[in-house]
Amino acid sequence: LPKHGVQHRIPTTGFPVHSQARRLSPEKFKVSKEEFDTLVKLGIARRSNSQFSSPLHVVPKPNGEWRPCGDFRRLNECTEFDRYPIPRIHDFTANLAGKCIFSKVDLIKGYHQIPVHPDDVPKTAVITPFGLFEFLRMPMGLKNAAQAFQRLMDSVCAGLDFVFVYLDDILVASESEEEHVKHLTALFD
């Protein structure tokens, strides 16, 4: 188990889902190939021989660039639901009374901080025109990814009552600048 004790599980029913590779425009092919080369280099993904395969989906980012990701809809249909609680935004409002200094912490590739359980790695396979790849770290788009990430953040931020975690956003709320510096120091230690 990793130091934080959280691994992503994908409990499924039925047979492995399988898809064919989708054709890509030359631009999307280049972006996708570069992204998967980077994911492999970083140890986030690896080449696969899995019986599972979800199609590659390339979506536009807000800045107009392309984001390659797995289209896990068919896998998600046969994945059992994780009932770990996800907070609702209005659950935080009472705790924010009297707070006037805020910082929002954005985790870069936060979902990739969570390893996929070794038994479930083959289920994350994505078929591309340049090969089959599976994820060693949790990719975006999986059913229960939000629950796994919330579980991680609840574990990491346990005891920090000034930290409010909602999905991959962390809000630090304080009553003064001096207190805020202490809160940020405690969070990052």
Which residues make up each language-model segment?
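Retroelement reverse transcriptase polymerase core
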Residues: 1-189
